[in-house]
Amino acid sequence: MEEREESSSHEHLKEKLRELEEEWTAMKTGKNSSAVSWITVEDALEYVENSPRNLMLSLQHKPKAEMIQEISPLRRKLFHDSDDDDQTKKTTLLSHSSCWSSNVTSSSDTTKAKKKTTIRRFVSVTMVLLLSWVLVVLMNHFDHLSMNTQIITLVPT
């Protein structure tokens, strides 16, 4: 039963490959396609043809410097970098990326913002409580004053 499933999936993959090859030859012979797009598509197909497992195995066994040398021109083409010096090989892959911007907030920035908001909340609650206490004290004080004046005026003669 497993052999039938494997053979049917294998045949399905072969059929897909044939369809892709036919489409590829049709693209190559087409009048509207240019040589530049052919090169780009050929490079893309070269990467697609490698299975993910083979790609991962090759990445595990290659030295890091060799990987950066291979990836660097592709990354430059992707992000339209114009620098061709050796500094890009020594730096990280994200250092020259246009996706990496200064707008990204670090975790320390978010913790500082949280501290500011908690301090602001604390200060505002404290001010409200303090003002309400002052209001209560003033109201009680005025009540006592008014009571005292009434008592003084009500003293018998």
Swiss-Prot record:
Where does the source fall among the domains of life?
Eukaryota
Residues annotated as domain KASH: 104-157
Q: Where are the transmembrane segments?
A: 122-142
Q: Where is the signal peptide?
A: none
Any one GO cellular component localisation term in the record:
nuclear membrane
Q: Where is this motif: Required for nuclear localization?
A: 154-157
Report the membrane topology from the UniProt record.
Single-pass membrane protein
Nuclease is among the record's keywords: no
Keywords for the protein's UniProt record, in alphabetical order: Membrane, Nucleus, Transmembrane, Transmembrane helix
Residue ranges the record marks as coiled coil = none
Location in or out of the cell: Nucleus membrane
Quaternary organization: Interacts with SUN1 and SUN2.
The domain-related comment in the record is: The KASH domain, which contains a transmembrane domain, mediates the nuclear envelope targeting and is involved in the binding to the SUN proteins.
Annotated protein name in UniProt: Protein SINE4
Species this chain originates from? Arabidopsis thaliana (Mouse-ear cress)
